């Protein structure tokens, strides 16, 4: 009894009363009336155990106090002692009655409420409602289901809305599941399959009407499903990231440059593995679509094409890397050669620097010797500065004397200032005149520069003309046509601008008589053109004869091509024979691969059997865990019943003890009366004898 009360008190001390205020069951008046007798017995039992184990009000154990010690010495004293004990019991009963009721309530709560979440608490409900609302809104629940969602709806739900939310959340966990029309019957089985840890708090009859007093249970169930969905999304994101990282790692490894032949072999194996992986993924995706009764295999084919494009890109990058490696090695070789040349030059520079360092050392030594002479020079300079300061003082005194002399003569400083102002005006006018003259000279220079530029451009065009004529004469001389280029040249003196032409240069001044463009050069160019046309006609006649020869050569080529075609037919027949032999070899390889695939299927089947056995074992473990929990619950119930039986026995024994004590007191009173009567009789007999 003492151990059970101590465990109950321990549990009560470790509970947070502010967290579970809404979960404490409040007893009704009928229940209090029904439990009145049991509560009285329980309080008596607790009071007696406290009186036995501790001193009242202190908590000191009474192991060292003699329990059999009595305070009464006479019958009257005995009645007073029992009355005091009864008064103490009645006083302590009121102080401990609330503790015993709270212990009963906590024990009943521990047995009945298996869900540790404070689902009845309004603050907790609002928190999980906000979390459910945020998850549904984030994942576009209202768009996918065409059903509005709000916090108010989660506080006052409908049966239809609950079913829509439940279906949406479960389909995110199991997208291939098909719901029937009577979903209320399926919800319980789905929760059982999901292993909802607080399934015992939900009945099948409550699922048909979730919006009543049991809504807090279903709200907690929806919150649990939201949490599982969040965890599943996190796991899937991790898997996707790992796959992406794996692919990127393979691509980065394959894009790295090669160093040894072993790395080349490893890369070849990775290429083969990549191709096998692409084909396996294509087969699995197409098989999944086949199981789903879908005839559209284009997405998987597109993925296969993209995969092969990436594979080709990787191979191209590998080729490019090899090319870059070769280029880099060649560049390194060139750099090494340059470095060797630099080493030679640096050696020569080192020798030169060594000689320079010797010169600098000599210079430093000379400067050290000169630095020893500088203190004397500085003293001389100080003495000279003192002399100059004395001269400045003398000049200042002279200036003051001159001012005095001018004042005596009547000449003021204002006259000097006026003359200085006139002087400044004259200097300004001179500056303006100089600026205008500079502008005129600059304009003349700019015009002269423009004329020089025009003349230079003319000379450049003449040079281009001369170079084109030289090229023409060379090309014509190569063709066997000699051209006199002296008659086609234009001669202009380059010292033409040195003369002073204030009114410009005329055409006659540029080109003297007999050497102008229209007079002599144009005629010679037309004559040369006529000669070229005559030569073209003769060349065309020669070309006609050459074309006839070419036709004869083409006829010979056609005959030889026919011979080549016959040889190619023979070669194609040989290739067809080779391909037939190759196909037979491939057929044998395919048969061997089929046998390998059969063995792999057997291995996969054995793996599946192992997985099913493992899952069955896990289910057995979970079922045994559930049975263990049920046994624990039954054990707690039996413990509670035994607790009540012990309380009942203690109540009966306490009543029996009280009755015995009252009967003993009555018998003691009767014995006292009898003894007094006997004493009176003895006294009377003695008195009679004496008389």
UniProtKB/Swiss-Prot annotation:
What does the record list as coiled-coil region(s)?
376-446, 522-686
Q: Does the keyword Coiled coil feature in the UniProt annotation?
A: yes
Alphabetical keyword list = Cell cycle, Cell division, Centromere, Chromosome, Coiled coil, Kinetochore, Mitosis, Nucleus, Phosphoprotein
Q: Which GO terms describe its biological process?
A: attachment of mitotic spindle microtubules to kinetochore; cell division; chromosome segregation; mitotic sister chromatid biorientation; protein localization to kinetochore
Cite the record's Basic and acidic residues compositional bias ranges: 10-19
Tell me which domain of life the UniProt entry assigns to the organism this sequence originates from: Eukaryota
Q: What is its main location?
A: nucleus
User: InterPro entries under this entry?
Assistant: DUF5595, Kinetochore_Ndc80, Ndc80_CH, Ndc80_sf
Stretches with biased composition (Polar residues): 20-42
Annotated region described as Disordered, given as residue ranges: 1-95
> What's in the GO CC field?
condensed chromosome, centromeric region; kinetochore; Ndc80 complex; nucleus; outer kinetochore
Q: Which GO terms describe its molecular function?
A: identical protein binding
Q: State the function annotated in the UniProt record.
A: Acts as a component of the essential kinetochore-associated NDC80 complex, which is involved in chromosome segregation and spindle checkpoint activity.
Q: How would you summarize the oligomeric state and partners of this protein?
A: Component of the NDC80 complex, which consists of NDC80, NUF2, SPC24 and SPC25. The NDC80 complex is formed by two subcomplexes, NDC80-NUF2 and SPC24-SPC25, which are joined end-to-end through their coiled-coil domains. It has a rod-like structure with a length of 570 Angstroms and globular domains at either end. The NDC80-NUF2 globular domains are probably directed to microtubules, the SPC24-SPC25 globular domains to the centromere. NDC80 probably interacts with SMC1 and SMC2. Also interacts with KIN3. Interacts with DMC1.
Q: Which family does it belong to?
A: Belongs to the NDC80/HEC1 family.
- PANTHER family in the record: KINETOCHORE PROTEIN NDC80 (PTHR10643), KINETOCHORE PROTEIN NDC80 HOMOLOG (PTHR10643:SF2)
- Miscellaneous information on this protein: Present with 1160 molecules/cell in log phase SD medium.
The name of this protein is: Kinetochore protein NDC80
What is the name of the gene encoding this protein?
NDC80
